[in-house]
A protein has these predicted regions:
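Conserved small/polar residues in nucleotide/adenosyl-binding loops
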Residues: 1-5, 287-289
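Noncatalytic, helix-rich "gating/capping" subdomain that lines the substrate-entry/channel surface
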Residues: 3-59
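Contiguous, non-catalytic segments that form substrate-binding/exosite surfaces or channel walls
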Residues: 35-186
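Short acidic (Asp/Glu) and glycine-rich catalytic loops that position anionic groups and cofactors
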Residues: 120, 171, 203-210, 265-274, ...
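Active-site recognition of the HExxH zinc-binding catalytic motif
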Residues: 189-202, 226-227
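Post-HEXXH active-site segment of zinc metalloproteases
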Residues: 201-224
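Post-HExxH zinc-binding segment in Zn-dependent metallohydrolases
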Residues: 216-253
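Long, amphipathic alpha-helical stalk/connector segments used for oligomerization, subunit docking
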Residues: 238-287
Length: 289
């Protein structure tokens, strides 16, 4: 009776909730409690290691989290490859075979392109690594969020070690950022990226708030929105034309940088070990690795 009364969206919601319930109830409670505790400790160790530039602080926690994740996921889908289960949880219908085929195709074109571009060294401009007051960077963040359409009445902004976006409903979407005193571009593009996530969440139909349909069900879709704002819009010179003068008022070092020089810098391609700071080209290489 109830099934006949549900439309397609609510049938999907019920089906997804039952699937998640069936998976999660298979996990022993004591194991999951230990997993959550380990994750919290791992997060603290990661932050300490990051600030100390000492991977050895985090290494044992990383090993422990990998092993515990295998145990937990092994219970959710018994008999299924653990990594296939993890992929499917992020992107329903995805598996290792599909990813391997896709990555092989991308790698064939991408690696020669990266080598070709990075062989031509682009001169460093110290202006982009000059001191930038964190309060000024916060004001720049709001300039950018307002500019791209983030709704202040349905969101908030905070600070964390690693930028992220989370939502509790379409009317409560929270963005975080991190401000490096000598890397203002980092916070600027994090603001645009996370703003892309947030705008997506703020425009979900409020009828589905607090349901699995009230947030994007596929990570690929969500990340496509954030990276569209960050790269397709944010690295285009036309994006900056209406606000570049205001940027110079907030961060005076940019007053002496032409818009064309700014565009070249924000489209710089170079190898990096940090995914979130990687450029549009080498970012994919880090994902592939």
């Amino acid at each position: 009776v109830y099934k006949r009364q549900l439309d397609d969206t609510w049938r999907f919601i019920v089906k997804r909730m039952k699937r998640d319930y069936d998976r999660n109830k298979r996990i022993p409670a004591d194991l999951y409690e230990a997993f959550v505790r380990a994750a919290a400790e791992s997060g603290n160790a990661w932050e300490e290691a990051k600030n100390a530039s000492d991977f050895s602080i985090y290494a044992p926690h990383l090993r422990n989290m990998i092993e515990m994740t295998k145990q937990v996921i092994g219970y959710t889908d018994p008999g299924k490859d653990v990594y296939d289960t993890l992929l499917e949880q992020c992107e329903e219908g995805m598996d290792q075979a599909t990813i391997d085929r896709l990555f092989e195709e991308v790698k064939t074109e991408l690696i020669p392109l990266v080598e070709q571009i990075t062989a031509k060294k682009m001169p460093e401009n110290p202006t982009f690594h000059a001191y930038a007051d964190p309060d000024a960077q916060r004001r720049v963040q709001w300039l950018l969020l307002d500019y791209i359409g983030f709704r202040r009445d349905a969101g908030a902004v905070g600070e964390t070690e690693h930028p992220f976006t989370t939502n509790f409903s379409s009317k409560d979407v929270r963005v975080t950022n991190h401000y490096y005193e000598t890397e203002p571009l980092s916070a600027m593009f994090s603001a645009i990226h996370e703003g892309g996530h947030a705008i997506f969440e703020q425009n979900v139909n409020p009828e589905y708030d607090n349901t699995v349909a009230g947030s994007c069900c596929y990570m690929g879709v969500h990340e496509s929105q954030s990276r569209f704002y960050e790269n397709i819009l944010g690295r285009n010179i036309n994006f900056w034309k209406p606000i570049y003068e205001k940027l110079g008022e907030l961060l005076p070092q940019f007053k002496n940088v032409t818009l064309e020089a700014f565009e070249r810098e924000i489209n710089r391609v170079e190898n990096s070990m940090v995914r979130t700071e990687a450029d549009e080209v080498t970012y994919l290489s880090l994902i592939h690795i």
